[in-house]
């Protein structure tokens, strides 16, 4: 095996790379499609984009369930150990762009890029818990929909506080 992959990390990367790259591309495609909309339209379609995007990501993950179990729980020491953090960075960047475009960010706002990062990390960690707990797809979808309502409601409260 190692003659083909070089070492254990080479084998690991050969297994998880297609899944990791595919999910990242789905996530970026959703972000870019959302941000291509006019700023005043974005808040109106936000919930739909988020729910549809989460469903698409969930189906992608569950179609490659074992790959994502490895990626999430066995990637320490590989180039994929920060995979979730990479998704968080993308979410943070695009959320910040959204808040600037829709003028939710105002001078003196308590909402900082660091706060956005922390909230994005909480969202992704909770999203991937369904994989770590080996939930079946239908149960995972129900949990993700509840989590999304939770995060969406929380953001609504934070934005009102501004």
Where are these regions (language model features)?
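Solvent-exposed, amphipathic alpha-helical segments
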Residues: 22-33, 67, 122-130
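Helix-turn-helix/homeodomain-like alpha-helical modules used for DNA recognition
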Residues: 41-69
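C-terminal peripheral helix-coil segments that are non-catalytic and often amphipathic
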Residues: 63, 93-100, 116-162
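C-terminal/domain-terminus segments
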Residues: 71-88, 142-155
């Amino acid at each position: 095996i190692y003659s083909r992959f070089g070492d254990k990390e080479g084998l690991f990367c050969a297994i998880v790379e297609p899944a990791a790259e595919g999910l990242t591309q789905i996530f970026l495609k959703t972000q870019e499609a959302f941000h291509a909309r006019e700023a005043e339209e974005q808040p109106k379609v936000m919930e739909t984009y988020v729910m549809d995007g989460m469903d698409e990501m969930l189906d992608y993950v569950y179609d490659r369930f074992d790959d994502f179990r490895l990626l999430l729980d066995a990637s320490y020491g590989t180039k994929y150990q920060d995979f979730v953090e990479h998704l968080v960075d993308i979410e943070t960047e695009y959320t910040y762009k959204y808040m600037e475009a829709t003028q939710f960010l105002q001078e003196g706002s308590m909402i900082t890029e660091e706060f956005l990062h922390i909230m994005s990390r909480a969202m992704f960690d909770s999203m991937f818990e369904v994989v770590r707990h080996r939930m079946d797809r239908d149960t995972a979808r129900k949990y993700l929909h509840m989590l999304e309502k939770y995060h969406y409601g929380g953001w609504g409260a934070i934005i009102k506080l501004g």
